[in-house]
Amino acid sequence: MRDRLILLPGWGLGVSPLEPLAAALRGLDEHFRVEIEPLPVLASTTLQDWLDELDATLPDNVWLGGWSLGGMLATELAARRGERCCGLVTLASNPSFVSRDDWTSGMPAATFELFLGGFREAPNTTLKRFCLLCSQGSAEPRALASQLLGGAPKAQPDILLAGLELLGKLDTRSALQAFNGPQLHLFAGLDGLVPVQAASDVLALLPDVEVGLIEQACHAFLLEAPHELAAAIQGFLHESGDD
């Protein structure tokens, strides 16, 4: 089913941010199936539990993709499935959201720990702050943050906390290197959560994959530039289909 793409959303904000991109992709090719699958509702912080849930839910032999945490999970699932996955598309998705000694293009660990502590203390306030960080770099950050927050589902704090802790633990570099299918990784030049250096570092890690940069865009570039993203994804899918 090379004409089918499953997209996974990022942390805490539900499927709404991906809907404009899905609509733009369908508009470019009415025969191409684009579906958005919600993240698993799990209180576990163990990656295997999340992958087991996704592997049981999502069809085989499709393209896998996702935004931020969703892209990281799509990467891990693609590596698990191998030839049962047509290819991988990630959007503003850092192989390691948090900086490590050998991956410095992430959020400083101390900053992430403060954010995690803030969520434990005041989840609603911290989610609002997260929306502002997602929209940092946008021409209208507050309006975009309000749109993100307005579309977010009412999730239980313990479920959100588990997802946030997983985000802080994940390091998908081995999975990226293990997956031999076609890969496209798109980044935003004004991203307040994923440093732009991550794009160069991904290309250095994976010299044979496609890496793109939407320069004047924030982390929530799904809402800022859905048609530009859709055009890049469609071009990549067509090229991969011709190989």
Where in the sequence are the language-model features?
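Conserved alpha/beta-hydrolase catalytic His-Asp/Glu region
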Residues: 120-170, 174-175
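Short beta-strand/loop motif that positions the catalytic acidic residue
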Residues: 179, 185-187, 191
